[in-house]
């Protein structure tokens, strides 16, 4: 799977997971309607399905996905929560994405 497609799929997967967790947060912490649990459940089911689309071993996919999830969560912090990330947030994202790239794209024996 080409690298750009892999990272793009990870990004879409992260959005599905974050939405699936953010909607119950809105219900529990912000007093929003319980009906948010329906799209949350759909989003989490989509998240699980998207993880199955990668041809790599599941454990490797889950480990590498974490790096893109961290990037997406910090982006969410900035765009949705309105909190500007710190320099340390950006450093952490860089380290996580570097780890993701090493895990997913390093050469493997055939």
From Swiss-Prot:
Keywords: Cell inner membrane, Cell membrane, Membrane, Transmembrane, Transmembrane helix. Disulfide bonds: none annotated. The chain crosses the membrane at residues 7-27, 33-53, 63-83, 85-105. One of its GO terms (cellular component) is plasma membrane. Its main location: membrane. It is a multi-pass membrane protein. InterPro entries: UPF0060 (IPR003844). It comes from the Bacteria. Pfam families: UPF0060 (PF02694). It is found in: Cell inner membrane. Belongs to the UPF0060 family. PANTHER family: UPF0060 MEMBRANE PROTEIN YNFA. This is UPF0060 membrane protein PBPRB0495. The lineage of its organism: Bacteria, Pseudomonadati, Pseudomonadota, Gammaproteobacteria, Vibrionales.
